[in-house]
A protein has these predicted regions:
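Conserved catalytic cores of soluble enzyme domains
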Residues: 1-102
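Terminal amphipathic helices with adjacent charged low-complexity linkers/tails
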Residues: 78, 82-140
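Short secondary-structure boundary micro-motifs
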Residues: 17-19, 33, 61-62, 108, ...
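A generic structural signal for short, non-catalytic loop/turn and secondary-structure boundary residues
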Residues: 5-8, 115, 167
Length: 180
C-alpha cells in the first residue's frame, strides 16, 4: 500500500534472496529494479506442485521461477552470485540515481583533460573490416569516466545493452545494440 504512491518518485529496488510465491511476488516486480541472488531467489505466482497437479508437467521450482529464468523473462534486473553482491549492486545503483524525481542525479569528479587526451583506445575501436563484429560493451566502457558500468537485464535481450555509467561526472544511461 505504501509502495505504489512512491513509484516514479524515488528509486525502488528489491533484493530477492529466497523463495517468494503467490501474491508476495507482486511487490518486487513493481519496483524499478529487482536484484536476485543466483541459486537462492525464486518467484512464481503458482508453484511447481500446482503446475504438476493441473497440467501434469514435472518442473522444478528453479526451472519455473529461479533467478536465471526470471531474468530471461524480464522480471529480474540482475542476477548476482551472493547476498553481498546484491547489496553492493544496490549501493552502486543508488550512487547513480537521484534520491527523488525532484533531485538531480549525483555528480562525481570528471577525469582530467590530460587523462582524456592520452586515451587513444577510441581511435582504434572500430575494426577496419565492416563485416567484423565488435563488442559494444567495450565502447561504452571507453566512453564512460571509469570502467564501472552497471548493466541491467543483461540476459533478457542479449543483443541489447542497457546500462548506467558516467560521462564527465554526470550519470548517463546507455541503450545500445550489441552486434556480437
Amino acid at each position: 500500500r505504501r509502495q505504489l504512491p512512491l513509484s516514479g518518485r524515488s528509486p525502488q529496488i528489491s533484493i530477492m534472496m529466497g523463495k517468494s510465491a503467490g501474491g508476495a511476488v507482486y511487490a518486487p516486480v513493481t519496483t524499478d529494479f529487482v536484484i536476485a541472488v543466483d541459486e537462492e531467489a525464486e518467484m512464481y505466482v503458482t508453484g511447481p506442485n500446482v503446475i504438476r497437479e493441473v497440467t501434469g508437467e514435472d518442473i522444478t521450482s528453479a526451472e519455473l521461477g529461479g533467478a536465471r529464468q526470471q531474468e530471461l523473462n524480464g522480471n529480474v534486473s540482475a542476477v548476482v552470485p551472493s547476498e553481498d553482491d546484491a547489496f553492493d549492486m544496490v549501493r552502486d545503483l543508488l550512487d547513480h540515481l537521484p534520491l527523488t524525481c525532484f533531485d538531480e542525479s549525483p555528480e562525481f569528479a570528471a577525469p582530467s583533460d590530460a587523462e582524456v587526451a592520452e586515451d587513444e583506445d577510441l581511435n582504434a575501436f572500430m575494426p577496419d573490416d565492416t563485416n567484423a563484429g565488435y563488442d559494444m560493451m567495450d565502447l561504452l566502457t571507453q566512453l564512460g569516466d571509469d570502467e564501472d558500468l552497471i548493466e541491467i537485464q543483461e540476459n533478457f535481450a542479449p543483443n541489447m545493452i542497457t546500462a548506467f555509467g558516467r560521462i564527465d561526472g554526470k550519470t548517463v544511461g546507455f541503450v545500445a545494440n550489441n552486434p556480437m
